[in-house]
Structures are given as structure tokens and as C-alpha cells.
Amino acid sequence: MEVVILNENGDSVGNLEIVDEIFKSEVNNNLLYEAIKNELANRRQGTHSTKTRAEVSGGGKKPWRQKGTGRARAGSTRSPIWVGGGKTHTPKPRDYSYRLPKKMKRKALLSVLSLKYGSNVLKVFEDFTFDAPKTKRMASFISKVKEPNTRKVAFVVGKDESLGDNYNKLLLSLRNIKDLKLVNADSMSIHPLFYADEVYFTKTALSKLNARIKG
């Protein structure tokens, strides 16, 4: 299939031939759910920790004798039912990350791209050239080409030697724009693509993805 390449003004400047499955695969919602859940789990720090009755300070001595006081019996001030006592079934540091099979990740990526392309919210732009990084220029470009109701934008970029230093200048120009998420074509995440109102590709980024999918 061919996709239209746009310039900074949103005008067509050519086409790019890519394999059909990138934008015309069957959308698998269950697979998208599993892929997004996996990405979010892998982001978790897992540093949560609460002290048990064995770890809180104090409470080594029995507060009062067993009988004869009229009060409920107590063996330690570290008991979970006491104020300042330890907690039961406490969260402890753990690793939440797990691996998703490569074929599942690949199909999930094709699903989210096909979903966005089928919804007419995916655009491909020619590569940008810069004399110097300019956030103002890219912010103006985004506001010009996006739809009126669009808030979140995912921008997929790809690095190539032919671009010279323009790749780094593009990153510097885009990274501080509100509600814009940068996505690297070499390691594309499903989460920012799925939750974006619009998805933009540079020509180089789509070419790299096409080469990867073709194998």
C-alpha cells in the first residue's frame, strides 16, 4: 500500500510504499489490553514497603500482666490491632515486570497502528531540517496540522545517518511541547500510541518500521 507524505503545512508532497499489514491488520482488542498492561507493569518501581509486627520498634515487653487488671489481655504493643503496631499482610518490594512473547507484541503494535490509521488520525510527514532546535516552530506546526478536538499527540521519530544532526534537533524541539509524547521507531510502545488522539510519523520513522516488519 501507499501512504501520503505531508509537509509542514499539511500539503501532500509524495507517497511512501509500505507493507499492507502495518496499517491494515485486524485490530485485536484483547491483545492491545495485554500489551498495555504489560508496559504499565514493567514501569512499576515496586519499592512499596510497610513494616510488620516483627519490624516495628518497641513492644518487646508484655504491657501488663495477663490477669487481674480488668483489661483485655495483651502480649505486645506491636500487635496489628494497636495504634503504632505492625501491619498484617504488608506490601513488600517486588518486581512486577514480565515478558510478553515477541509475536504478541508485534501483533499488538500492528493492531494499534491499524486502529489509528482506520480512524483517520494517523499522519506521515516528511523529515524536518533545522538550523537550530526550535520548540516554537514545532509547536506552531503541531497546532496547524492537528484537528480542533485533538489534545494528545504521539510523535514517532526515527534516527538515520542521512539526517545528520537533524534528528537530535527534532527531539530537542519536540520534547517540551505540552501533551506531546515522543516515541522511538526502534522501540515503539503501545501505550502512548493507543491513548493519543492523533499519531504522527516522520518519513524516516515509518521507513524504519516498514523495514522491521518486512524482516
Swiss-Prot record:
Chain intervals for the UniProt region annotation (Disordered): 43-97
Gene Ontology CC: ribonucleoprotein complex; ribosome
Keywords: Ribonucleoprotein, Ribosomal protein, RNA-binding, rRNA-binding
Classification via InterPro entries: Ribosomal_uL4 (IPR002136), Ribosomal_uL4-like (IPR013005), Ribosomal_uL4_dom_sf (IPR023574)
Gene Ontology annotations of biological process type: translation
Gene3D superfamilies: 3.40.1370.10
Source organism, top-level taxon: Bacteria
GO MF, one example: rRNA binding
Function: One of the primary rRNA binding proteins, this protein initially binds near the 5'-end of the 23S rRNA. It is important during the early stages of 50S assembly. It makes multiple contacts with different domains of the 23S rRNA in the assembled 50S subunit and ribosome.
Family under the similarity heading: Belongs to the universal ribosomal protein uL4 family.
Oligomeric and partner information: Part of the 50S ribosomal subunit.
Protein name: Large ribosomal subunit protein uL4
Species whose genome carries this gene: Brachyspira hyodysenteriae (strain ATCC 49526 / WA1)
